[in-house]
């Protein structure tokens, strides 16, 4: 059994790594805390989430840049450059796959089994939905269908628990709704379903805004703003009666939507 001193030391290193923007080491430290099979505190949970979000975020940004350059080179007919870019893009995809599989193992084997609070359960299933969604951004064919289905299942489990355990204005529940709606828009290519979910949660939360305590007010109102921004963006993609729906992968649209930490 690990001593509380060891746990304290790992958390301190994670804080230092965050300050120094050394996110790979931040992830390593918090993964070691998770491997102790203890229920994480809110701070520990957030450190783990921020670390992985940054580690995966830099690769997602790289992948988008490479995909954009690849499309331009392809349009110019530069086949040799397209092949070079594809090889490099696949390297980034391999890194993304490893990172996402890594956090999924930590969640399934250590974090969820150590959970006692509904809030933590929602947090971890939301994370699972998010990281399967990140895989679905670049996977193709049957692989994409598999990770999309797993993402949907995780978001649905998180939503069921959130509806039973958390008030509608809780930042974790709002963040879940935000990311779940982004999933419908980007991965399922369904602006109608994305808008329906985002609008329902936005309207319910706005009517309960007075119940937000001081600690949650800033985070809650920020996520509500993101929900509203996405609704404004996505509404333009819903066809009027008699019009055709927009073609193409939603993830390739400009400003496909913002998600929460």
From Swiss-Prot:
InterPro entries (alphabetical): 14-3-3, 14-3-3_CS, 14-3-3_dom_sf, 14-3-3_domain
Domain of life according to the entry: Eukaryota
SMART domains reported for this sequence: 14_3_3
Cellular component GO terms held in the UniProt record: cytoplasm
GO annotation terms (biological process): protein localization; signal transduction
Region (Disordered): 237-261
Record field: transmembrane: none
Pfam family, one: 14-3-3
Assembly and binders: Homodimer.
PANTHER family recorded: 14-3-3 PROTEIN
The family this protein is said to belong to: Belongs to the 14-3-3 family.
Protein name per Swiss-Prot or TrEMBL: 14-3-3 protein 8
Gene: TFT8
